[in-house]
Structure formats: C-alpha cells, structure tokens
Amino acid sequence: YINSAREGVKRLGSLLEQYGTYEKNGIAFQDANEIWWLETIGGHHWIARRVPDDSYVVMPNQLGLDVFDLEDALFEQKEYMCSADMREFIEENHLDLSFDDCFNPRDAFGSHEDSDHVYNTPRAWFGLRYFNPHTMKWEGEDADYTPESDDLPWCMVPEKKITVEDVKYVLSSHFQGTPYDPY
C-alpha cells in the first residue's frame, strides 16, 4: 500500500478522513530518507509533521506537535500535511486564537490535564534532559522546563549521537538520577 513514509501519512490520512477515529493518537512513519509523525485529533481530522533530519522526538501518550504550518500543510506539503478541511475545522471550532497559519496544535487540540503531569510530560522531560543535558536548564526554580511543563519541545537536535543503549535507557527510565525518582 505504501512505499515511503510520506505515502504512509497520506494513506492513513485518507483512511482517517473517510472512516474517522474515536480518539487522539500518534504514529511514526519512517523510510530510508525521512520520518513523519502523524497525530489524529479525533473525528476525521489529522495533522502530520516531518521530523527534521538532525533531530529526535520523545513522544509520550499525548499530542506533542508544538508548531504547525497550516499553509505548507494545505499546499506545498514540504514539512507538514493535514486533513483537507483542517482550516475550516479550526475556524469553526475556534481552536486557534492566534489567527495565524503557523500555530501550536498542542494548545489547540491537546490536553493539559493533571494526569499528563504524572504520566506524560515527565517522560518527555526525562528523555529531552537525557539527550540534551546542557542545552537547557532542566531542574531548579529557574528551570527552562520541568516534568510538569506543558510547552516541552516536540523535537530537538541532540548534543551527541543517540545510541541504541541511550534509547533503551530512556525507555526504561523511572527518572533515576533526578529528584523525581520514586525509588
């Protein structure tokens, strides 16, 4: 059915537009040249963004895209794609208060629930902190981001090459080496 990551996004996107979905979800499509991240936002609507070549994504169980270029998604589709009626959906439901083609879908479609601060944002924070320990201040009163931050970056350029062992460590994390370690 598909021969590339881009085709995967378009194929799943067309199925979502036709059949819809009950809940929000995300899925990555990868080929030898690029990676795309698609998020369903409920109903028959979806958005997708290409992961920059030099970047990584830490994605817990919540919507994560933090920047979205609607103009590119609806026309050129160089870095972004979405369901055909996304602009109308956003306008009709008053989901973008910036009135700009470049908006934050996490704010428009995502959640900022207390449960996110227990189950989701801490996992993203730990991974970002692990892969970029010096890029940002991750702890303390003057931290750029904390485990409860709702504005964690969706993607970042790592400070060093990420290894399989690094990924295993982050995926098995219980926040070891931080004040948030429950053990």
Whereabouts are the PLM-identified features?
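Structured, non-membrane catalytic/scaffold regions adjacent to prosthetic-group chemistry
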Residues: Y1-V51, S55-P60, L152-P158, I162-E165
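C-terminus-biased signal that marks the final domain/tail of proteins
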Residues: V9, G13, G20, A32-I35, ...
